[in-house]
From Swiss-Prot:
<keyword id="KW-1003">Cell membrane</keyword>
<dbReference type="GO" id="GO:0080120">
    <property type="term" value="P:CAAX-box protein maturation"/>
</dbReference>
<dbReference type="GO" id="GO:0004175">
    <property type="term" value="F:endopeptidase activity"/>
</dbReference>
<keyword id="KW-0472">Membrane</keyword>
<feature type="transmembrane region" description="Helical">
    <location>
        <begin position="35"/>
        <end position="55"/>
    </location>
</feature>
<dbReference type="GO" id="GO:0005886">
    <property type="term" value="C:plasma membrane"/>
</dbReference>
<dbReference type="InterPro" id="IPR003675">
    <property type="entry name" value="Rce1/LyrA-like_dom"/>
</dbReference>
<protein>
    <recommendedName>
        <fullName>Uncharacterized protein YpbD</fullName>
    </recommendedName>
</protein>
<feature type="transmembrane region" description="Helical">
    <location>
        <begin position="97"/>
        <end position="117"/>
    </location>
</feature>
<feature type="transmembrane region" description="Helical">
    <location>
        <begin position="123"/>
        <end position="143"/>
    </location>
</feature>
<dbReference type="Pfam" id="PF02517">
    <property type="entry name" value="Rce1-like"/>
</dbReference>
<feature type="transmembrane region" description="Helical">
    <location>
        <begin position="144"/>
        <end position="164"/>
    </location>
</feature>
<keyword id="KW-0812">Transmembrane</keyword>
<keyword id="KW-1133">Transmembrane helix</keyword>
Length: 189
């Protein structure tokens, strides 16, 4: 639902900021190889940095209150892919394509971070989302192509959403195995 509101906001702001639909279409170039070089490379760097944070910092500093687990833990992989594509498209269109193009990198990045309001009370998460937003904005500045930050955004979200899903499945299988062993054990008779 939120992503549909973001798409609507991007369309409404786009009508205000852009003179013509062709101006919006100029922001996208699927043939640009920097989609791979920058988009994939930056996504891998962000994923590795996030994994390092999870390894070296206490979990209460990067815990989002379980919201992402609630969203992704029981979804199928195709549904996760669809949702993360929608999220990446909607957010990059609004924050990079419309806002950054017209009000600048810093302002768009700060608005992006602030709208991830569930992170405002967690200083580490807020720093991370602000840094990632700025990095996505820099990729757009460097390339002028929305596919580049959208690709990175999609990969980052999809990897972590799938990780949440796989952890949920693994935990369920472990719990089933433990329950099965408890039923078979002589103490339970």
């Amino acid at each position: 639902m939120t992503q549909l509101l973001i798409i609507f906001a991007a369309a409404a702001a786009g009508l205000f900021f852009f003179e013509d639909v062709r101006d919006v279409l100029k922001l996208w170039d699927i043939r640009d190889m920097r989609i791979i070089w920058y988009g994939v490379s930056i996504a891998v760097i962000v994923i590795l940095a996030d994994m390092a944070v999870m390894k070296w910092f206490p979990s209460h500093l990067y815990d989002d209150g379980g919201i992402n687990k609630k969203i992704f833990s029981k979804r199928s992989i195709p549904h996760i892919i669809f949702l993360t594509l929608l999220i990446a498209f909607a957010e990059e269109m609004l924050f990079r394509g419309v806002l950054q193009t017209h009000i600048g990198l810093w302002t768009a990045s700060l608005i992006f971070a602030a709208l991830h309001f569930r992170y405002l009370s967690k200083w580490l998460l807020f720093i991370m989302v602000t840094a990632i937003s700025f990095l996505l904005g820099l990729m757009y500045e460097w390339t002028g192509n929305l596919f580049v930050p959208m690709t990175a955004h999609f990969i980052i979200d999809a990897v972590f959403a799938c990780q949440i899903r796989f952890e949920h499945v693994r935990r369920d299988k472990h719990d089933e195995h433990v329950e099965s062993r408890e039923k078979k054990s002589p103490e339970s008779l």
